[in-house]
């Protein structure tokens, strides 16, 4: 299964990608911002999950989520937002935009695992509200 990780921090992309690899997900694409992510998404029809930061240049994560959700072929794609924006208002805004799950940085690999399992329907359901 191909996943797309979007973050303007190369360090954060590496952390997320390494965690996903340890979880058995070897096919991970990376983008630095929403414009690059959109380009990769439209050129890689087999991307199944989008993991995106919120605050990025050119097109932020919230704008990316709205653009993805506006396309019928992506309406069911699981989206996880990984961000420092941890306020209740931000979480609600992201969920209303179409994010399926939300992780506040910093986070542990276990949290990413649980959130990914939750959006894929493969986990026990624990950790869905973190």
UniProtKB/Swiss-Prot annotation:
The cofactor note from the UniProt entry for this protein is: Binds 1 Mg(2+) ion per subunit.
Where is this protein chiefly located? cytoplasm
Keywords carried by this UniProt record:
Chemotaxis, Cytoplasm, Flagellar rotation, Magnesium, Metal-binding, Phosphoprotein, Two-component regulatory system
PANTHER family under this entry?
PROTEIN PILG, STRESS RESPONSE REGULATOR PROTEIN 1
CC terms in the record's Gene Ontology section: cytoplasm
Report which superkingdom the organism of origin falls in.
Answer: Bacteria
Which residues make up the binding site for Mg(2+)? 7-8, 53, 55
Needed cofactors = Mg(2+)
What task does this protein carry out?
Involved in the transmission of sensory signals from the chemoreceptors to the flagellar motors. CheY seems to regulate the clockwise (CW) rotation.
Gene Ontology molecular function? metal ion binding
Q: Domain Response regulatory: where?
A: 2-120
- GO BP of this protein: archaeal or bacterial-type flagellum-dependent cell motility; chemotaxis; phosphorelay signal transduction system
Q: What is this protein called?
A: Chemotaxis protein CheY homolog
Give the matching SUPFAM superfamilies.
CheY-like
What compartments host this protein? Answer: Cytoplasm
């Amino acid at each position: 299964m191909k996943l797309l990780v979007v973050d303007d921090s190369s360090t954060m992309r590496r952390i997320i990608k390494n965690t996903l690899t340890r979880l058995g997900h070897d096919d991970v694409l990376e983008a630095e911002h929403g414009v690059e992510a959109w380009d990769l998404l439209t050129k890689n029809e087999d991307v199944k999950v989008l993991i995106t930061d919120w605050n990025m240049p050119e097109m932020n994560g919230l704008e990316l989520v709205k653009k993805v959700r506006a396309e019928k072929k992506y309406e069911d794609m699981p989206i996880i937002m990984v961000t420092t924006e941890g306020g209740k208002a931000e979480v609600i805004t992201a969920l209303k935009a179409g994010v399926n799950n939300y992780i506040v940085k910093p986070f542990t690999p276990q949290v990413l695992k649980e959130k990914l399992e939750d959006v894929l329907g493969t986990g026990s359901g624990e950790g869905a509200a973190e």
